[in-house]
Protein backbone atom coordinates (compact mmCIF):
# COMPACT_ATOMS: atom_id res chain seq x y z
CA UNK A 1 0.00 0.00 0.00
CA UNK A 2 2.76 2.42 0.90
CA UNK A 3 5.45 1.50 -1.63
CA UNK A 4 6.39 -1.23 -4.13
CA UNK A 5 9.24 -2.26 -1.84
CA UNK A 6 7.09 -2.67 1.25
CA UNK A 7 7.25 -6.47 1.47
CA UNK A 8 11.00 -6.62 0.94
CA UNK A 9 11.63 -3.83 3.41
CA UNK A 10 9.44 -5.46 6.06
CA UNK A 11 11.29 -8.74 5.62
CA UNK A 12 14.67 -7.08 6.17
CA UNK A 13 13.37 -5.43 9.32
CA UNK A 14 11.65 -8.43 10.89
CA UNK A 15 14.55 -9.20 13.24
CA UNK A 16 15.59 -5.60 13.93
CA UNK A 17 14.26 -5.60 17.46
CA UNK A 18 16.32 -8.71 18.30
CA UNK A 19 19.77 -7.10 17.77
CA UNK A 20 21.79 -7.40 20.96
CA UNK A 21 23.73 -4.79 22.92
CA UNK A 22 25.90 -5.03 26.03
CA UNK A 23 25.38 -2.55 28.89
CA UNK A 24 28.30 -1.92 31.23
CA UNK A 25 26.69 -0.93 34.54
CA UNK A 26 28.17 0.32 37.80
CA UNK A 27 26.55 1.17 41.10
CA UNK A 28 24.15 -1.77 41.40
CA UNK A 29 23.76 -2.86 45.00
CA UNK A 30 22.06 -5.90 46.48
CA UNK A 31 18.49 -5.07 47.48
CA UNK A 32 15.00 -6.48 47.39
CA UNK A 33 14.80 -5.32 43.76
CA UNK A 34 17.97 -7.16 42.74
CA UNK A 35 17.45 -10.29 44.85
CA UNK A 36 15.25 -11.79 42.13
CA UNK A 37 17.89 -11.45 39.40
CA UNK A 38 19.57 -14.58 38.05
CA UNK A 39 22.99 -12.94 37.86
CA UNK A 40 25.14 -11.81 40.80
CA UNK A 41 25.50 -8.14 41.65
CA UNK A 42 29.18 -7.27 42.05
CA UNK A 43 30.33 -5.45 45.15
CA UNK A 44 32.66 -3.33 43.03
CA UNK A 45 33.49 -2.87 39.37
CA UNK A 46 31.10 -3.34 36.48
CA UNK A 47 28.22 -5.67 35.72
CA UNK A 48 27.63 -6.50 32.04
CA UNK A 49 24.10 -7.07 30.80
CA UNK A 50 23.10 -8.19 27.29
CA UNK A 51 19.90 -6.54 26.09
CA UNK A 52 17.86 -6.90 22.85
CA UNK A 53 17.22 -3.64 21.00
CA UNK A 54 13.47 -3.78 21.56
CA UNK A 55 13.96 -3.75 25.35
CA UNK A 56 16.77 -1.20 25.66
CA UNK A 57 14.70 1.66 27.06
CA UNK A 58 12.85 -0.57 29.53
CA UNK A 59 16.18 -1.98 30.73
CA UNK A 60 17.60 1.54 31.15
CA UNK A 61 14.70 2.49 33.38
CA UNK A 62 15.01 -0.75 35.36
CA UNK A 63 18.75 -0.20 35.94
CA UNK A 64 18.06 3.36 37.10
CA UNK A 65 15.45 2.13 39.57
CA UNK A 66 18.02 -0.30 41.00
CA UNK A 67 20.51 2.53 41.55
CA UNK A 68 22.78 1.62 38.66
CA UNK A 69 24.56 3.85 36.15
CA UNK A 70 25.22 2.83 32.54
CA UNK A 71 28.79 3.78 31.59
CA UNK A 72 28.83 2.31 28.08
CA UNK A 73 26.64 0.55 25.53
CA UNK A 74 28.17 -1.62 22.83
CA UNK A 75 26.63 -3.72 20.07
CA UNK A 76 27.21 -7.43 20.53
CA UNK A 77 29.57 -8.23 17.66
CA UNK A 78 27.77 -9.76 14.72
CA UNK A 79 24.49 -9.81 16.65
CA UNK A 80 25.44 -13.35 17.59
CA UNK A 81 26.00 -15.10 20.93
CA UNK A 82 29.30 -14.57 22.72
CA UNK A 83 32.06 -16.97 21.53
CA UNK A 84 31.78 -18.92 24.80
CA UNK A 85 28.91 -19.56 27.18
CA UNK A 86 30.79 -19.86 30.43
CA UNK A 87 29.49 -17.34 32.95
CA UNK A 88 26.39 -16.42 30.96
CA UNK A 89 23.30 -16.35 33.13
CA UNK A 90 19.80 -17.41 32.21
CA UNK A 91 17.47 -14.64 31.03
CA UNK A 92 16.33 -12.51 33.95
CA UNK A 93 12.69 -12.88 34.95
CA UNK A 94 12.59 -9.56 36.77
CA UNK A 95 9.87 -7.35 35.28
CA UNK A 96 9.62 -9.62 32.26
CA UNK A 97 13.05 -8.62 31.02
CA UNK A 98 14.58 -10.59 28.19
CA UNK A 99 18.08 -9.42 29.10
CA UNK A 100 21.04 -11.58 30.05
CA UNK A 101 24.07 -10.94 32.26
CA UNK A 102 27.51 -11.85 30.95
CA UNK A 103 30.75 -12.37 32.79
CA UNK A 104 32.83 -10.53 30.20
CA UNK A 105 32.14 -7.39 28.17
CA UNK A 106 31.91 -7.36 24.40
CA UNK A 107 35.28 -7.16 22.63
CA UNK A 108 36.94 -3.78 22.96
CA UNK A 109 37.10 -3.52 19.19
CA UNK A 110 33.39 -2.81 19.16
CA UNK A 111 32.55 0.84 18.74
CA UNK A 112 30.72 2.25 21.74
CA UNK A 113 27.55 4.14 21.01
CA UNK A 114 28.88 7.24 22.73
CA UNK A 115 31.49 7.61 19.99
CA UNK A 116 30.11 9.87 17.29
CA UNK A 117 31.24 11.42 14.03
CA UNK A 118 32.27 15.04 13.93
CA UNK A 119 29.59 17.71 13.94
CA UNK A 120 27.62 17.89 10.71
CA UNK A 121 28.44 20.82 8.47
CA UNK A 122 25.83 23.59 8.44
CA UNK A 123 24.87 22.76 4.85
CA UNK A 124 24.62 19.02 5.53
CA UNK A 125 20.96 19.02 6.53
CA UNK A 126 19.08 15.86 5.52
CA UNK A 127 15.75 16.55 3.84
CA UNK A 128 13.15 14.23 2.25
CA UNK A 129 15.26 11.08 2.27
CA UNK A 130 11.93 9.23 2.19
CA UNK A 131 8.89 10.62 0.36
CA UNK A 132 5.15 9.83 0.59
CA UNK A 133 5.17 7.50 -2.43
CA UNK A 134 8.14 5.52 -1.12
CA UNK A 135 8.10 5.83 2.68
CA UNK A 136 10.44 4.03 5.01
CA UNK A 137 8.68 1.14 6.75
CA UNK A 138 9.94 0.96 10.30
CA UNK A 139 9.00 -1.03 13.37
CA UNK A 140 7.47 0.31 16.58
CA UNK A 141 9.88 -0.37 19.44
CA UNK A 142 8.09 1.55 22.20
CA UNK A 143 4.79 3.24 22.90
CA UNK A 144 4.22 4.34 26.49
CA UNK A 145 2.20 7.09 28.24
CA UNK A 146 3.83 10.36 29.29
CA UNK A 147 1.06 11.82 31.45
CA UNK A 148 0.11 10.66 34.91
CA UNK A 149 -3.22 9.75 36.46
CA UNK A 150 -5.46 12.80 36.64
CA UNK A 151 -3.94 14.44 33.56
CA UNK A 152 -5.95 15.98 30.75
CA UNK A 153 -5.83 13.99 27.51
CA UNK A 154 -3.62 11.20 26.21
CA UNK A 155 0.05 11.75 25.35
CA UNK A 156 2.40 8.94 24.28
CA UNK A 157 6.15 8.60 23.69
CA UNK A 158 6.91 6.44 20.65
CA UNK A 159 10.20 5.06 19.36
CA UNK A 160 10.66 3.57 15.88
CA UNK A 161 13.46 1.36 14.54
CA UNK A 162 15.39 2.83 11.58
CA UNK A 163 18.07 0.14 11.29
CA UNK A 164 17.02 -1.21 7.88
CA UNK A 165 17.22 2.13 6.06
CA UNK A 166 19.27 5.30 5.76
CA UNK A 167 16.94 7.83 7.40
CA UNK A 168 18.92 10.34 9.44
CA UNK A 169 17.88 13.64 10.98
CA UNK A 170 18.96 16.56 13.14
CA UNK A 171 17.53 18.03 16.32
CA UNK A 172 14.63 20.34 15.46
CA UNK A 173 13.47 18.49 12.34
CA UNK A 174 10.19 16.63 11.77
CA UNK A 175 9.12 13.37 10.17
CA UNK A 176 5.88 12.48 8.43
CA UNK A 177 3.67 9.58 9.46
CA UNK A 178 1.22 7.99 7.01
CA UNK A 179 -1.69 6.31 8.81
CA UNK A 180 -3.04 3.19 7.10
CA UNK A 181 -6.47 3.06 5.48
CA UNK A 182 -8.58 5.51 3.50
CA UNK A 183 -10.59 8.62 4.26
CA UNK A 184 -14.35 8.98 3.75
CA UNK A 185 -13.70 9.78 0.07
CA UNK A 186 -11.86 6.52 -0.51
CA UNK A 187 -8.45 8.17 -0.76
CA UNK A 188 -5.37 7.15 1.27
CA UNK A 189 -4.96 9.16 4.45
CA UNK A 190 -2.61 12.11 4.15
CA UNK A 191 0.60 12.16 6.11
CA UNK A 192 0.92 14.21 9.29
CA UNK A 193 4.12 15.90 10.41
CA UNK A 194 5.44 15.46 13.94
CA UNK A 195 8.40 17.16 15.60
CA UNK A 196 11.16 14.71 16.46
CA UNK A 197 11.69 14.28 20.21
CA UNK A 198 15.05 12.47 20.07
CA UNK A 199 18.58 13.57 19.23
CA UNK A 200 20.25 12.53 15.98
CA UNK A 201 21.62 9.51 17.89
CA UNK A 202 18.18 8.31 18.99
CA UNK A 203 16.95 7.34 22.44
CA UNK A 204 19.16 4.23 22.45
CA UNK A 205 22.27 6.14 21.34
CA UNK A 206 22.99 3.93 18.31
CA UNK A 207 21.80 6.21 15.46
CA UNK A 208 19.12 3.61 14.64
CA UNK A 209 15.91 5.03 16.14
CA UNK A 210 13.67 8.10 16.08
CA UNK A 211 11.17 9.14 18.76
CA UNK A 212 7.99 11.22 18.82
CA UNK A 213 5.82 12.80 21.50
CA UNK A 214 2.16 12.57 20.38
CA UNK A 215 -1.06 13.86 21.92
CA UNK A 216 -4.31 12.28 20.78
CA UNK A 217 -6.37 14.98 19.07
CA UNK A 218 -9.97 15.06 20.28
CA UNK A 219 -12.53 17.79 19.64
CA UNK A 220 -16.24 18.52 19.26
CA UNK A 221 -17.54 19.15 15.72
CA UNK A 222 -20.40 21.50 14.83
CA UNK A 223 -22.93 18.74 15.51
CA UNK A 224 -21.57 18.31 19.02
CA UNK A 225 -20.02 14.95 18.21
CA UNK A 226 -16.62 13.94 19.58
CA UNK A 227 -14.09 13.56 16.78
CA UNK A 228 -10.68 11.94 17.18
CA UNK A 229 -7.72 12.80 14.98
CA UNK A 230 -6.95 10.04 12.49
CA UNK A 231 -3.16 9.98 12.72
CA UNK A 232 -2.77 10.87 16.40
CA UNK A 233 -5.29 8.17 17.41
CA UNK A 234 -3.50 5.65 15.20
CA UNK A 235 -0.16 6.50 16.82
CA UNK A 236 -1.43 6.52 20.39
CA UNK A 237 -2.86 3.02 19.92
CA UNK A 238 -0.16 1.42 17.77
CA UNK A 239 1.48 -1.71 19.21
CA UNK A 240 5.14 -2.60 19.67
CA UNK A 241 6.27 -4.63 16.66
CA UNK A 242 3.78 -3.00 14.26
CA UNK A 243 4.95 -1.49 10.97
CA UNK A 244 4.98 2.29 10.61
CA UNK A 245 5.27 4.33 7.37
CA UNK A 246 7.67 7.26 7.79
CA UNK A 247 8.64 10.12 5.46
CA UNK A 248 11.18 12.92 5.73
CA UNK A 249 12.92 14.34 7.54
CA UNK A 250 11.86 17.91 6.86
CA UNK A 251 12.52 21.32 8.34
CA UNK A 252 15.36 23.81 8.71
CA UNK A 253 13.61 26.45 10.83
CA UNK A 254 14.00 24.86 14.27
CA UNK A 255 17.53 23.46 14.10
CA UNK A 256 19.76 23.64 17.16
CA UNK A 257 22.74 25.90 16.39
CA UNK A 258 26.12 24.11 16.46
CA UNK A 259 27.64 26.90 18.60
CA UNK A 260 28.34 25.38 22.03
CA UNK A 261 28.30 28.87 23.60
CA UNK A 262 24.85 29.80 22.31
CA UNK A 263 22.00 30.69 24.67
CA UNK A 264 18.77 28.84 23.92
CA UNK A 265 15.41 30.24 25.10
CA UNK A 266 12.62 27.70 24.57
CA UNK A 267 8.91 28.54 24.87
CA UNK A 268 6.74 25.41 24.72
CA UNK A 269 3.18 24.31 25.36
CA UNK A 270 2.16 20.65 25.59
CA UNK A 271 3.75 18.41 22.98
CA UNK A 272 5.63 21.46 21.72
CA UNK A 273 8.25 20.15 24.15
CA UNK A 274 9.31 17.57 21.50
CA UNK A 275 12.13 19.47 19.72
CA UNK A 276 13.31 20.90 23.03
CA UNK A 277 13.59 17.44 24.53
CA UNK A 278 15.97 16.67 21.64
CA UNK A 279 17.92 19.89 22.34
CA UNK A 280 18.23 19.23 26.06
CA UNK A 281 19.15 15.57 25.68
CA UNK A 282 21.96 16.60 23.30
CA UNK A 283 23.13 19.36 25.64
CA UNK A 284 23.01 17.55 28.97
CA UNK A 285 22.35 13.81 28.70
CA UNK A 286 24.50 12.59 25.82
CA UNK A 287 27.67 14.57 26.63
CA UNK A 288 29.43 13.66 23.37
CA UNK A 289 32.99 14.86 22.86
CA UNK A 290 32.03 16.72 19.68
CA UNK A 291 29.39 18.86 21.44
CA UNK A 292 29.83 20.29 24.94
CA UNK A 293 27.15 22.89 25.63
CA UNK A 294 28.46 25.86 27.63
CA UNK A 295 25.68 28.43 27.21
CA UNK A 296 22.36 28.91 29.01
CA UNK A 297 19.30 26.85 28.09
CA UNK A 298 16.03 28.20 29.49
CA UNK A 299 12.79 26.26 29.03
CA UNK A 300 9.49 27.98 29.85
CA UNK A 301 6.91 25.20 29.64
CA UNK A 302 3.14 25.76 29.64
CA UNK A 303 0.84 22.93 30.72
CA UNK A 304 -2.66 22.75 32.28
CA UNK A 305 -1.87 20.52 35.29
CA UNK A 306 1.15 19.08 37.08
CA UNK A 307 0.14 15.64 35.83
CA UNK A 308 0.59 16.93 32.28
CA UNK A 309 4.27 17.87 32.66
CA UNK A 310 5.92 15.74 29.97
CA UNK A 311 9.34 14.22 30.75
CA UNK A 312 9.05 15.78 34.22
CA UNK A 313 11.59 13.61 36.05
CA UNK A 314 14.25 14.01 33.35
CA UNK A 315 13.76 17.77 33.08
CA UNK A 316 13.99 18.33 36.81
CA UNK A 317 17.00 16.04 37.13
CA UNK A 318 18.86 18.01 34.43
CA UNK A 319 17.93 21.31 36.09
CA UNK A 320 19.35 20.02 39.39
CA UNK A 321 22.54 18.63 37.83
CA UNK A 322 23.28 21.64 35.59
CA UNK A 323 22.03 24.70 37.53
CA UNK A 324 24.47 27.05 35.77
CA UNK A 325 23.40 25.98 32.28
CA UNK A 326 19.76 24.91 32.45
CA UNK A 327 16.82 26.83 33.84
CA UNK A 328 13.34 25.30 34.01
CA UNK A 329 10.19 27.41 34.48
CA UNK A 330 6.65 26.00 34.50
CA UNK A 331 3.41 27.84 33.72
CA UNK A 332 0.69 25.52 35.09
CA UNK A 333 -2.55 27.21 34.07
CA UNK A 334 -5.03 25.34 36.29
CA UNK A 335 -2.88 25.38 39.41
CA UNK A 336 -0.96 28.67 39.39
CA UNK A 337 -2.14 32.28 39.33
CA UNK A 338 -0.67 35.23 37.49
CA UNK A 339 -0.14 38.67 39.02
CA UNK A 340 -3.77 39.65 38.27
CA UNK A 341 -5.17 36.54 39.95
CA UNK A 342 -6.05 34.76 36.71
CA UNK A 343 -4.68 31.56 35.26
CA UNK A 344 -0.93 31.34 34.73
CA UNK A 345 -0.05 31.05 31.06
CA UNK A 346 3.31 31.06 29.35
CA UNK A 347 3.07 34.78 28.44
CA UNK A 348 2.74 35.63 32.13
CA UNK A 349 6.02 33.85 32.85
CA UNK A 350 7.60 35.84 30.03
CA UNK A 351 6.33 39.07 31.63
CA UNK A 352 7.59 38.02 35.07
CA UNK A 353 11.08 37.44 33.69
CA UNK A 354 10.98 40.38 31.29
CA UNK A 355 14.26 42.10 32.15
CA UNK A 356 16.34 38.93 32.17
CA UNK A 357 14.81 37.65 28.93
CA UNK A 358 15.27 40.99 27.21
CA UNK A 359 18.92 41.19 28.20
CA UNK A 360 19.49 37.65 26.95
CA UNK A 361 17.85 38.42 23.61
CA UNK A 362 20.20 41.35 23.02
CA UNK A 363 23.08 38.89 22.94
CA UNK A 364 23.80 37.87 19.31
CA UNK A 365 24.45 34.34 20.56
CA UNK A 366 20.90 33.96 21.92
CA UNK A 367 18.33 31.99 19.92
CA UNK A 368 14.65 32.06 20.89
CA UNK A 369 12.36 29.16 19.95
CA UNK A 370 8.58 28.80 20.19
CA UNK A 371 6.78 25.49 19.68
CA UNK A 372 3.25 24.35 20.49
CA UNK A 373 -0.34 25.30 19.73
CA UNK A 374 -0.78 28.28 17.43
CA UNK A 375 -2.97 29.91 20.07
CA UNK A 376 0.14 30.63 22.15
CA UNK A 377 1.49 33.16 19.62
CA UNK A 378 -0.78 36.19 20.34
CA UNK A 379 -0.09 36.04 24.08
CA UNK A 380 3.66 35.69 23.53
CA UNK A 381 3.67 38.57 21.03
CA UNK A 382 1.73 40.74 23.48
CA UNK A 383 4.22 39.98 26.25
CA UNK A 384 7.22 40.73 24.03
CA UNK A 385 5.57 43.90 22.69
CA UNK A 386 5.30 45.26 26.23
CA UNK A 387 8.84 44.09 26.92
CA UNK A 388 10.22 45.92 23.88
CA UNK A 389 8.30 49.12 24.69
CA UNK A 390 9.80 49.17 28.18
CA UNK A 391 13.19 49.22 26.50
CA UNK A 392 12.37 51.84 23.88
CA UNK A 393 12.02 49.48 20.92
CA UNK A 394 9.25 48.20 18.67
CA UNK A 395 8.75 44.45 18.99
CA UNK A 396 7.92 43.76 15.34
CA UNK A 397 11.09 45.55 14.24
CA UNK A 398 13.28 43.71 16.75
CA UNK A 399 11.62 40.40 15.88
CA UNK A 400 12.34 41.03 12.19
CA UNK A 401 15.99 41.71 13.04
CA UNK A 402 16.26 38.44 14.96
CA UNK A 403 14.67 36.54 12.07
CA UNK A 404 17.20 38.06 9.68
CA UNK A 405 19.98 36.91 12.01
CA UNK A 406 18.36 33.42 12.21
CA UNK A 407 17.82 33.82 15.96
CA UNK A 408 13.99 33.69 16.09
CA UNK A 409 12.43 30.27 15.41
CA UNK A 410 8.71 29.41 15.45
CA UNK A 411 6.87 26.14 14.83
CA UNK A 412 3.21 26.22 15.84
CA UNK A 413 0.24 24.15 14.70
Curated annotation (Swiss-Prot):
Induction: By light, and also by 0.55 M NaCl. Residues 18-76 form the CpcD-like domain. GO terms for molecular function: ferredoxin-NADP+ reductase activity. Residues 133-256 form the FAD-binding FR-type domain. The keyword tRNA processing does not apply. The keyword Oxidoreductase applies. InterPro entries: CpcD-like_dom, FAD-bd_FR_type, Flavoprot_Pyr_Nucl_cyt_Rdtase, FNR, FNR_nucleotide-bd, FNR_plant_Cyanobacteria, OxRdtase_FAD/NAD-bd, Riboflavin_synthase-like_b-brl. It is a peripheral membrane protein. Its cofactor is FAD. Transmembrane segments: none annotated. PANTHER family: PTHR43314. NCBIfam families: FNRPetHCyano. Purifies with both the classic phycobilisome (PBS) supercomplex (CpcG-PBS) and a photosystem I-associated PBS called CpcL-PBS; it accumulates to a higher level in CpcL-PBS. In both PBS it can be cross-linked to both phycocyanin subunits. This is Ferredoxin--NADP reductase. It comes from Synechocystis sp. (strain ATCC 27184 / PCC 6803 / Kazusa). The gene is petH.
